Amino acid sequence: MTKKRLLYWLFVVFMVLALVLSAIPIIASDLFRQPYSPMWPHIRRAMDLFRIDPFPVGGGAPPRWPFWREPADAFVYHRDLTLTTSDGVNLTAWYVPAHEPGAPTFLLTHGLLDSKWTMLRLAPWLQEAGYNVLLLDFRGHGGSDHQPASIGPDEVQDVQAAIDWLEAEGVGEQVIGLGMSLGAAALVNTAVQDDRIDALILDSLFADWSDTDFAEGYRLPPDWLVPGVPSPEDLLPLIDIPVFIIHGTADVLTKVDHAHRLYNAANEPKRIWINDSGHGWSAWTYPELHQELVLDFLDQSGLTPLD
């Protein structure tokens, strides 16, 4: 091979490598911000059916079962909803009404790569405690339109669409947001700009996306691949409603120090519960204690159903 030909092929290899490297952020962003192909809900259901969790983070947690596909499986009456956001995204949701009128409403928001039916186990006891419950599929999740996730900011429109519907139905006077991970971030982002949320229960929330360590669990993009993610640690001081922070010491996706940072940033009244569960597992690892602490928090916050 002549020197000229060698230089030619070296140039070709260099250009190919340059193109590949330049495409990595785009490809990674597409994979991680849009991991929601039409097949994903079916894959996620199969994982639950065979007891495979996408976040195997330990903590001695029992499985998140019984496996309920629909609210009817949980023995609760519900309405199937389709909501439309201000930017035209169609969302699917379930509404579980309280047994008595005039009750506060729980808005349950799931984590990344999950859907409303993974939050379904909370609905029966919340209804029995006297609350309405709305379970929402974020954009790109469950039965909602397959739009990219934004780790908080774009999901604000999803949360607001849910609250708009609650107000139109006359059950949005008192709204309690209970979110896990991505769902908690969306609630915080919403509460900063929308005063229709009366209390926040934040489970496994990151204080700052760029400080999370996902290397030991499910691989998600680093901060430089997901720019513009607001820091809940910076947003909480702007919120003047009761906040309950929940986290597990076995969470390897968002380490427990994030919970302490969030608690320090939040205004009073605030509460924190640290246990030994994994990412988003507190309600399943300690269901009775979780219920007790949530209801006590709401009692102290003046958000209990009327007798």
Predicted segments, located by residue:
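Hydrolase active-site cap/lid region
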Residues: 50, 184-241, 274, 284
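The serine-hydrolase catalytic nucleophile loop
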Residues: 112-125, 138
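Alpha/beta-hydrolase active-site loop
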Residues: 118, 149-170
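Conserved alpha/beta-hydrolase
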Residues: 126-145
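Post-His helix in hydrolase/transferase enzymes
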Residues: 283-296
